[in-house]
Amino acid sequence: MINLRKTHPILKIINHSFIDLPAPSNISAWWNFGSLLGICLVIQILTGLFLAMHYTSDTLTAFSSVAHICRDVNHGWLLRNLHANGASMFFMCLFLHVGRGIYYGSYLYKETWNIGVILLLTVMATAFVGYVLPWGQMSFWGATVITNLLSAIPYIGTTLAEWIWGGFAVDKATLTRFFAFHFILPFIITALAIVHLLFLHETGSNNPSGINPDSDKIPFHPYYTIKDALGLMFLLLVLLLLALFSPDLLGDPDNFSPANPLNTPPHIKPEWYFLFAYAILRSIPNKLGGVLALLASILILLIIPLLHTANQRSMMFRPISQTLFWILTANLITLTWIGGQPVEQPFIIIGQLASMLYFMLILVLMPLAGLFENYMLKPKW
């Protein structure tokens, strides 16, 4: 009898996607993050579902309902800690996944890359609305500051901000709709992830060398299922260490105080994974300019395929591009640090220089490095 997984209409799709999928024989651990992101998404949906059973999206009871989950619900503290730190793990995997794509030239699969950028934006939106739900001080003021940026849009800005708020400020209507968004968006992310995979399987995976791997493929199972399982062990180890030993390490102490519109925290800042973009926003002393720079810092990923000038796909054999890539990485870490600092010297000038370097590297220096490397490869005699 022919194997059921190869004939059954549904199992056949799963088989072609995760079992008999031909994969390059040389993909490294940097290719683990796709599966880890899928697992992060499942963890977030499951923990979020159980949290939603006990959470109330009302300004009067939201904060105390989160406290109730942590104190009175069976293993509620664990669910909350896994969900909060799961978001951090999600973004860690996302940044590494995008970094891998830039380093090895995976962005040349344009459809897969563009869906990936849309996924990144959707995950960022989900994390933002989710951070508002506990209704602590930083939740409230973070929501106020970021949604207020919409008012910088000429002509329609104020109307747009009030439409999002459902009133004249962040209040009960805002919290209720943010809870609704936070519930639905992960399912939209799941659908987008399936489309992302669909486009990826049209072309097959890239590999570290950037050379067409069609002549040397191996089945995904058991080789890469085992490899992904190892990655999963590391992910769960770090997540559990965070959730069980220092669950509040990455959070903000201000969020232990209930939201108070009459008392502004000394330093309003988002979660660590938004700090790089927040630093770019703050580095421009103009509201609309800052908003445009914030958008550009993420949307610039969409034009990376158009800026590829090198004859080789991967950076594996391109030392100048490699150097610039690691300067970009260090620059993003610097921006993340600056985003968490108060708006005073020397942080202002460091942030402005780092923001300028970020755009310079992607738009000018990396394409020029590609052209120079092409020139260096040509025989000179």
Curated annotation (Swiss-Prot):
- Binding positions (heme b b562): 83, 182
Entry GO terms, CC? mitochondrial inner membrane; respiratory chain complex III
Q: What is its main location?
A: mitochondrion
Q: Which GO terms describe its molecular function?
A: metal ion binding; ubiquinol-cytochrome-c reductase activity
One of its Pfam families is Cytochrome_B
Instruction: Give the GO biological process terms.
Output: mitochondrial electron transport, ubiquinol to cytochrome c
**Residues the record lists as binding a ubiquinone:** 201
Name the cofactor(s): heme b
Its keywords, alphabetically, are: Electron transport, Heme, Iron, Membrane, Metal-binding, Mitochondrion, Mitochondrion inner membrane, Respiratory chain, Transmembrane, Transmembrane helix, Transport, Ubiquinone
Task: Describe its assembly.
Answer: The cytochrome bc1 complex contains 11 subunits: 3 respiratory subunits (MT-CYB, CYC1 and UQCRFS1), 2 core proteins (UQCRC1 and UQCRC2) and 6 low-molecular weight proteins (UQCRH/QCR6, UQCRB/QCR7, UQCRQ/QCR8, UQCR10/QCR9, UQCR11/QCR10 and a cleavage product of UQCRFS1). This cytochrome bc1 complex then forms a dimer.
Other notes: Heme 1 (or BL or b562) is low-potential and absorbs at about 562 nm, and heme 2 (or BH or b566) is high-potential and absorbs at about 566 nm.
Query: What is the protein's name according to its record?
Result: Cytochrome b
